[in-house]
């Protein structure tokens, strides 16, 4: 049973007590809850015993983790259940590869919060983050570029991108940006 944590640390925390904010709610996590949340903060982890599974289920009820099955597309499926948000960073593009910079630019400079499926779509189609798609004034143009008659139906984009050739590449990019503290999962 794999999982990944959602939310952001709001106050200085330790490994024993963690202050997390997610969707307008503030949580104080201690003990196994804090440990499990921290272990999934920058990538996927798994519960190793019954106590951790119990803590993981409690975190899921709180909305602080997404649990997925241990299959190839499991990480992608989990990431489709979150929103990708920019983290506060002084020099967000410094030290990143070209592909990471492209993904980060899509995540941080569009006028909307992208889903994982939308990011996979943009990268799969080799659509560059040009000025005409970035910013609040260009949201409609970006939405029209992503959502066509073939992708507008409920969950069709998520399902199509699950079979995309670059799906795993984009999952690795997102996890790399998460580890480098350039994005947060909302």
PLM segments and residue spans:
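Long, charge-rich, low-complexity alpha-helical segments
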Residues: 25-186
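Short, amphipathic alpha-helical interface elements at domain boundaries
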Residues: 1-42
């Amino acid at each position: 049973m794999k999982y990944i944590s959602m939310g952001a640390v709001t106050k200085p925390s330790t490994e024993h007590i963690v202050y997390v904010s997610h969707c307008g709610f503030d949580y104080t996590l201690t003990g196994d809850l804090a440990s499990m949340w921290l272990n999934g903060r920058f990538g996927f982890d798994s519960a190793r015993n019954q106590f951790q599974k119990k803590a993981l289920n409690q975190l899921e009820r709180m909305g602080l983790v997404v649990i997925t099955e241990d299959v190839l597309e499991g990480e992608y499926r989990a990431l489709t259940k979150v929103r990708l948000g920019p983290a506060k960073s002084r020099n967000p593009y410094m030290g990143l590869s070209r592909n990471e910079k492209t993904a980060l630019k899509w995540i941080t400079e569009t006028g909307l919060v992208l889903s994982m499926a939308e990011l996979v779509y943009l990268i799969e189609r080799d659509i560059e983050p040009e000025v005409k798609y970035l910013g609040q004034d260009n949201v409609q143009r970006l939405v029209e570029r992503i959502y066509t008659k073939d992708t507008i139906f409920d969950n069709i984009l998520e399902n199509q991108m699950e079979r995309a050739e670059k799906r795993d590449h984009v999952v690795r990019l997102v996890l790399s940006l998460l580890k480098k503290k350039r994005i947060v999962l909302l």
